[in-house]
């Protein structure tokens, strides 16, 4: 069961979460805390240690949101590595040069240095689609409008008019290389929790969502 609890901005969120956890910190029972970033967990653990006093203290597992997604995504993909932006852009560059749909594309005959600027934008766009869970089937309007022409260079319109093809092939190459982008990591995490919720994640407190 999901419960949404509104905490006023003037309240001490660390104190509020410590109260939600209650005595679990002394028993090691499994509440997981997810903050927008890493630092709040340090304050929470310090507060719980103070409340525990001389008793044995087992702090709850705490994650930033990105760490939480990473933890879930790697359960079925333990050997995957995070790919950096330059390497990811180079994969996109290779796809533009090798896919038949881009045989006559202006960027297909240029070097990586000429492609890198737009490659980073293309990577960011694909990553955003993945992070927001947008399926290729929903990109029909983007591709249709790009065929008519957005207010960007024609070479970029040609890329966008085939964005679903680029994205599918990009995902394929990432899978073969056992690499994660931030977006594909999110996809893997959704797939992992889509069938069932792992036993150790039955009680998760997402705290400070206003900070996202």
Label the predicted regions.
Residues 1-21:
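N- or domain-start disorder-to-order transition segments that initiate the globular core
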Residues 9, 39-40, 211:
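Short, glycine-/Ser/Thr-/acidic-enriched flexible segments
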Residues 25, 29-31, 200-203:
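Short coil/turn segments at beta-strand junctions that form active-site/ligand-binding loops
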Residues 28-40:
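Conserved RecA-like ASCE P-loop NTPase motor core of nucleic-acid helicases/translocases
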Residues 34-35, 62-63, 205-206:
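Short hydrophobic beta-strand that contains or immediately precedes a catalytic carboxylate
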Residues 38-198:
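Basic/charged alpha-beta structural segments of nucleotide/phosphate-handling enzymes
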Residues 197, 203-212:
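Extended, H/D-rich, highly charged conserved domains that either
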């Amino acid at each position: 069961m999901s419960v949404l609890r509104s905490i006023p901005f003037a309240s001490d969120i660390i104190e509020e979460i410590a109260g939600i956890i209650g005595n679990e910190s002394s028993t090691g029972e499994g509440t997981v805390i997810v903050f927008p970033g890493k630092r709040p967990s340090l304050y929470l653990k310090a507060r719980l240690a103070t409340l525990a006093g001389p008793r044995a203290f087992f702090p709850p597992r705490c994650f930033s949101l990105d760490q939480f997604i990473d933890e879930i995504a790697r359960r079925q993909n333990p050997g995957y590595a995070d790919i950096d932006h330059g390497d990811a852009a180079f994969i996109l560059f290779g796809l533009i040069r090798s896919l038949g749909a881009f045989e006559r594309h202006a960027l297909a005959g240029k070097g990586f240095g000429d492609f890198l600027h737009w490659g980073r934008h293309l990577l960011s766009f694909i990553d955003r689609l993945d992070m927001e869970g947008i399926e290729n089937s929903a990109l029909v309007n983007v591709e249709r409008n790009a065929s008519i022409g957005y207010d960007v260079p024609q070479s970029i319109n040609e890329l966008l008019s085939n964005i679903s093809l680029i994205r599918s092939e990009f995902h394929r190459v990432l899978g073969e290389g056992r690499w994660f982008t931030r977006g594909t990591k999110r996809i893997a995490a959704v797939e992992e929790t889509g069938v069932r919720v792992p036993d150790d994640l039955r009680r998760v407190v997402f705290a400070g969502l206003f900070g996202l």
